[in-house]
A protein has these predicted regions:
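Non-catalytic interaction/clamp surfaces of large macromolecular machines
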Residues: 1-22
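Short acidic alpha-helix initiation/capping motifs at coil-to-helix transition points
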Residues: 1-3, 28-32
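Short, surface-exposed acidic
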Residues: 15-26, 45-52
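Phosphate-handling DNA/RNA-contact segment within nucleic-acid enzymes
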Residues: 30-168
Length: 170
């Protein structure tokens, strides 16, 4: 899709393989902030459900619009491989550079780690704590499948407890 070229250029520029991009479910949210909302409405979701999911926000001027646009998208999965939120990296000069889904009933970034669903199955007894999404993905592609990252700038006690549940060495 030509609309996703900017995202694909970024990911291939970071030397990610198609296999790695597929494994992590990476994608691109286009510049039109209404596409996701329109798609979800067609699938039968109500505006309230879309807003509560954290994928969109309501503004008086624009109505219900996607939270993420012109961003490479990183699905955030729980330990059972269920998507519970998203991270998005802006393409270009926009701010913020990285944006996570807001806290929802199913997404609490303090209690989750990016990549833990894959690191847990590595069963190495070790976990490598990285700074962010791209670090985790690059480490996995290089064969270090026990890499994880916190979701945001703070590393929490809950995340430390998670690490200790799944690894002897950090």
């Amino acid at each position: 899709d030509p609309r996703g070229e900017v995202g694909m250029r970024y990911l291939t520029g970071r030397k990610l393989t198609d296999e790695t991009m597929h494994h992590f479910g990476l994608g691109y949210a286009g510049k039109n902030g209404e596409q996701v909302v329109q798609y979800l409405r067609k699938k039968g979701f109500t505006d309230e459900e879309i807003k509560d999911s954290g994928l969109a926000m309501f503004s008086e001027q624009r109505g219900l619009r996607s939270q993420f646009w012109n961003r490479v998208m990183f699905p955030i999965q729980d330990i059972n491989h269920r998507v519970i939120g998203f991270g998005g990296r802006v393409m270009g000069d926009g701010e913020p550079k990285y944006l996570n889904s807001p806290e929802t009933m199913i997404f609490d970034k303090r209690r989750n780690l990016y990549g833990l669903n894959f690191a847990r199955t590595a069963r190495t007894g070790n976990i490598i704590l990285c700074e962010g999404y791209m670090d985790v993905i690059a480490m996995h592609q290089a064969g270090f499948t026990q890499a994880v990252a916190s979701l945001g700038t703070a590393f929490t006690v809950e995340q430390a407890n998670l690490l200790h549940r799944y690894a002897e060495n950090i």
